[in-house]
């Protein structure tokens, strides 16, 4: 859907968002830039916020999604699988709710 009103999936672990669109974007940015700081700059967020999100993701999954080393960071094979799975889930959800979303959007004040 190209409309600005949309539904975004979030995978919860208790009260914690284990994974969602922001964390997917952060992993992709780390993959592109090779570092958490580079990803944070690209996403216009603080390094501290990016680091906390990485720590949270690494705690929520049975294996780390991001590995750090002197001079940078990289995403793991598990992270690539998680991002791909999340994107498939989001695409299926968008498709499943498309008709109802269009109807709901027609009722929302200030629609685009």
What are these regions (language model features)?
Residues 41:
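Alpha-helical residues within the helix-turn-helix
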Residues 44-46:
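Central "turn" residue of the DNA-binding helix-turn-helix
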Residues 53:
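Residues within the DNA-recognition helix of helix-turn-helix
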Residues 30-38:
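Short helix-boundary/capping micro-motifs
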Residues 86-104:
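Alpha-helical linker/hinge and terminal dimerization helices associated
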Residues 2-15:
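Short, Lys/Arg-enriched N-terminal segment that forms or immediately precedes the first helix
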Residues 59-74:
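A short LG(V/I)-centered, amphipathic sequence patch enriched
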């Amino acid at each position: 859907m190209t409309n600005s009103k949309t539904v975004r999936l979030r995978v919860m672990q208790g009260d914690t968002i284990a994974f969602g669109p922001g964390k997917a974007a952060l992993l992709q940015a780390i993959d592109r830039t090779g570092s958490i700081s580079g990803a944070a700059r690209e996403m216009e967020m603080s390094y501290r916020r990016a680091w906390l999100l990485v720590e949270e993701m690494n705690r929520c999954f049975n294996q780390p999604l991001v590995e750090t080393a002197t001079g940078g960071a990289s995403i793991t094979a598990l992270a690539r699988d998680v991002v791909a799975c999340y994107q498939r889930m989001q695409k299926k959800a968008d498709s499943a709710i498309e008709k109802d979303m269009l109807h709901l959007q027609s009722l929302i004040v200030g629609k685009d």
